[in-house]
Amino acid sequence: ASGETEEALATIPLLSRSDLKREVEEVSQEEEKVQGITHLSYQENTSGITYLNLFFTLYGLKAEDVPYAYLLTTILGSMDTDNHTYQELTRISNTYTGGMSYAITSYDDKADNTKYVPVCAVRGKALTSNADKMMQLMGEVLNHTRFTDTGRLREILMEEKASWDMSLFDRGHALVMMRLMSYYSPAAQFKEQGSLSYYYFLSDLLEHFDEKAEHIKARLAETAAKIFTRKNLIVQEVGLKEEKQAVVNHLDAVIGDMPEGEACHTLSFVFPETGINEGFLSSGKVQYVAKGGNFVKHGFKFTGALRVMETILRYEYLWKRIRVLGGAYGAFTRIATNGDALLCSYRDPNLSETLKAYKELPEYLRHFNISEREMTKYVIGTMAPAETQLTPSMKGERAMVMRFTGQTHDDRQKVREQIIDCTQEDIRALAGLMDSVVSDKYFCVLGSEDKLKAESNLFDHLRSLTK
């Protein structure tokens, strides 16, 4: 198409904004108490499959427990329990379920980056006729895992560390984005405990494994006991009446042996400070360069126009400045409704040039000017991801996101309308907001040791990436 004239391109049929659906879908789930536990049902035809999600809130943990909570999710299902070897657990899971997973995650408040809901999410799916077997397995793993086998523990830690070592550089952008946001966002600081900080925690445990083994086993058992209590639990299933009934009927298999625990609803984590503006030295030849800040702290508000701006930056400014001129594989933005925002380049041969491109971005927005046809294309391109068909489990997850973040139907409706009605003036009006983000002092880079050392005056700290 690059050889075509503007006139020829303009003859290609294009949707108009009036073709876009303005209404967002209603999202609701039924809520009741079952044996004193909050039970949510997301009604959706799942063709006889029960999707079961157990959310254990982590408010009762201390900051120093959090790395052990992340470690725990790697260990569950991979160590023996009171009644089964870990090989048997795998066999039972493969026979009767479509898979089970354990993960620490958090849901950030829609407006305030100091608030979030930290959870351990235990997810499983099974044919509804096997829901009882799946729930027995969950109960066994959550309530009866034995953390006593030192040899097996070392094996799991070594596998986990090896997998981090292999993927460290490839997921460089994810690591620097999380590390960067942890400088200015308490919500991101929690997630960062499962990112680069977790890799360093893991490395330290292995390095001192012989003297720390007993301590590690005790901490894992204590952390599991603090997390897996009835008071922390919220149950959600996705399905119809049969699925709901199966979960209610067999809930005892999960909670029968689970202690009541203490109710706790306040966040009190204080994580160790890492310092800011770090450069992580690696043997690779390219950089991941991230810069960001929080615009709500500077008095700006999130609007749907930011989503359109992200599309425009991806295909216009960042594409041309950082990919075409700079030679990087790519660059992208992350903007959250709570004001946490960042720019990040991917496999980038440059460093200070990229930071300069970020700094000059607001100026580009101030003078933003394209044809109405192009603008409509960007609006349609922004809407496309929202039109993806969701699977039943994805719909269930969306309902949980809304519940935990405080996002309402009206919030979603408003953003959708702001996207569809977005004008070039709206994009130009974002220059001040983006200026506040790129003028904040925060950045983080992972890249070539030579390159970072040559520009070491940029950084507050240079650290070796691998341990």
Where are these regions (language model features)?
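Generic recognition of flexible, low-complexity loop/linker segments
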Residues: 27-28, 38-42, 218-226, 232-234, ...
